[in-house]
Swiss-Prot record:
<feature type="binding site">
    <location>
        <position position="348"/>
    </location>
    <ligand>
        <name>Mn(2+) 1</name>
    </ligand>
</feature>
<feature type="binding site">
    <location>
        <position position="10"/>
    </location>
    <ligand>
        <name>Mn(2+) 1</name>
    </ligand>
</feature>
<dbReference type="GO" id="GO:0030145">
    <property type="term" value="F:manganese ion binding"/>
</dbReference>
<dbReference type="GO" id="GO:0009117">
    <property type="term" value="P:nucleotide metabolic process"/>
</dbReference>
<comment type="function">
    <text>Isomerase that catalyzes the conversion of deoxy-ribose 1-phosphate (dRib-1-P) and ribose 1-phosphate (Rib-1-P) to deoxy-ribose 5-phosphate (dRib-5-P) and ribose 5-phosphate (Rib-5-P), respectively.</text>
</comment>
<protein>
    <recommendedName>
        <fullName>Phosphopentomutase</fullName>
        <ecNumber>5.4.2.7</ecNumber>
    </recommendedName>
</protein>
<keyword id="KW-0464">Manganese</keyword>
<keyword id="KW-0963">Cytoplasm</keyword>
<dbReference type="Pfam" id="PF01676">
    <property type="entry name" value="Metalloenzyme"/>
</dbReference>
<dbReference type="InterPro" id="IPR017850">
    <property type="entry name" value="Alkaline_phosphatase_core_sf"/>
</dbReference>
<dbReference type="GO" id="GO:0043094">
    <property type="term" value="P:metabolic compound salvage"/>
</dbReference>
<dbReference type="GO" id="GO:0000287">
    <property type="term" value="F:magnesium ion binding"/>
</dbReference>
<dbReference type="GO" id="GO:0006018">
    <property type="term" value="P:2-deoxyribose 1-phosphate catabolic process"/>
</dbReference>
<dbReference type="GO" id="GO:0008973">
    <property type="term" value="F:phosphopentomutase activity"/>
</dbReference>
<feature type="binding site">
    <location>
        <position position="306"/>
    </location>
    <ligand>
        <name>Mn(2+) 2</name>
    </ligand>
</feature>
<comment type="pathway">
    <text>Carbohydrate degradation; 2-deoxy-D-ribose 1-phosphate degradation; D-glyceraldehyde 3-phosphate and acetaldehyde from 2-deoxy-alpha-D-ribose 1-phosphate: step 1/2.</text>
</comment>
<dbReference type="InterPro" id="IPR010045">
    <property type="entry name" value="DeoB"/>
</dbReference>
């Protein structure tokens, strides 16, 4: 029986990538800086002390981080009791966004530029907004700028409730984000609007990676908070991903947990399981691992690391999340059988100590555990697509166009 359990720790970078200078991210190090702050006692909100992640250490995260940066994370040394193969990978896609990272992991790097809305104010063209307004029968939009999602609902949420005008905003990523109140605007209305925006962007050749529904609740700016009902309406993959190949060539199953299905536009997904919150995502993953059949990929994205702690520059929260995940990792490891593969990786960085609120261009860990495979140093992988190619070889699928088998 062959099964792959692929877990993406969203934004868990382990040191700036070789091309980080193109993104002004030289020196960024999501994992290393979290470890440093914990060691120095500067990440003690809701937790305390040095970062405690024994299971990640056992899978090789410390050694992988050292190979990526040339030095061990502060307070750690070489770990000799590693049970997994470990290495690190750099991205060849043009962007440092979720879609690019995940597609490249699945064997389809995004080599051309996305459409970005670069103006800090009046970010979306009026001609585009007018098309959306006409088709959606809205009275207008508010926002239309670069913004942090939590900041903009605090600033414009009350006006949105009064006017019923959706809040639209973007970032340095290729995204069109729409924030609306779940009760006063309606969750179904928000999803419908996002589908309309996705249709118009595609029709008029705006190569925007994601339209993101950002629902929130609360009665005033002191109470507004985003809910777990976020949805991503992604552009469809340009080529066949390894998850689609598994379904097409082996009639296999791909179980998508969290926002994975949205990232691939539902393409190459057999079953989509909605799950929110780090603990619940881990529980759902464990549940699906226990019942996974032959030729199955259980594919989980742990979004909280990125959305709750990375973008919000919350070092303590990120550290606490890593410790929570590590506490669930022992059970995950115990469920991996002789012919299974457990793969832990990330899609980009989001250093909570870095300037601004955006992603960081970083190398990502590649940790592969299987009781039936001899542990090995995987080296510096020149593309995330090596993961997709490895999965393709493992399931005896036709070759992917990018990447090399690591095993």
């Amino acid at each position: 029986m062959k099964r792959v359990f692929l877990i993406v720790l969203d934004s868990f970078g382990i040191g700036s990538s070789p091309d980080a200078d193109k993104f002004n991210d030289v020196g960024s190090n999501t994992f290393g800086h979290i470890v440093e702050k914990c060691f120095l006692g500067e990440a003690n909100v809701g937790r305390k002390g040095v970062l405690c992640i024994p299971n990640l250490v056992k899978l090789g995260i410390i050694n992988a981080a050292k190979e990526s940066t040339g030095q061990y994370p502060l307070g750690f040394n070489y770990s000799s009791n590693v049970i997994a193969s470990y290495g690190f990978a750099s991205e060849i896609s043009s962007g440092k966004d979720t879609t690019s990272g995940h597609w490249e992991i699945a064997g389809v790097p995004v080599l051309d530029d996305w459409c970005y809305f670069k103006e800090k104010q009046n970010s979306f063209p009026e001609s585009l907004l007018e098309k959306i307004i006409r088709r959606s029968e809205l009275t207008g939009f508010i926002g239309n700028c670069h913004a942090s999602g939590t900041d903009i609902i605090s600033r414009l949420g009350e006006e949105h409730i009064q006017t019923k005008k959706p809040i639209v905003y973007t970032s340095s990523d290729s995204v069109f984000q729409i924030a609306c109140h779940e009760e006063f605007f309606g969750l179904s209305n928000l999803y419908k609007l996002c589908k309309t925006v996705r249709f118009i962007l595609d029709r008029y050749n705006y190569k925007v990676a994601r339209v993101i529904a950002r629902p929130f609740i609360g009665n005033d700016k002191l109470q507004f908070q985003r809910t777990g009902n976020r949805r991503d309406f992604s552009i469809k993959p340009f080529a066949t991903t390894v998850i689609k190949k598994l379904i097409d060539e082996k009639q296999g199953q791909v179980i998508a947990i969290g926002k994975v299905s949205d990232i691939y536009g539902g393409i190459g997904i057999s079953k989509n399981i909605k799950s929110t919150g780090l603990y619940e995502l881990c529980s759902t993953t464990i549940h699906e691992m226990k019942k996974a059949l032959n030729n199955t990929i259980v594919f989980t994205n742990l979004v909280d690391f990125d959305s709750n702690w990375g973008h919000r520059r919350d070092v303590s929260g990120y550290a606490k999340g890593l410790e929570l995940f590590d506490s669930r990792l022992s059970e995950i490891i115990s469920l991996v059988q002789k012919n299974d593969l457990l793969i832990l990786t990330a899609d980009h960085g989001c250093d909570p100590t870095w300037i601004g609120t955006d992603h960081t261009r970083e190398n990502v860990p590649v940790l592969i555990y299987s009781p039936g495979i001899k542990k090995n140093f995987l080296g510096h992988r020149k593309t995330f697509a090596d993961i997709g190619q490895t999965i393709a070889k493992y399931f005896l699928l036709t070759d992917m166009s990018y990447g090399q088998n690591m095993l």
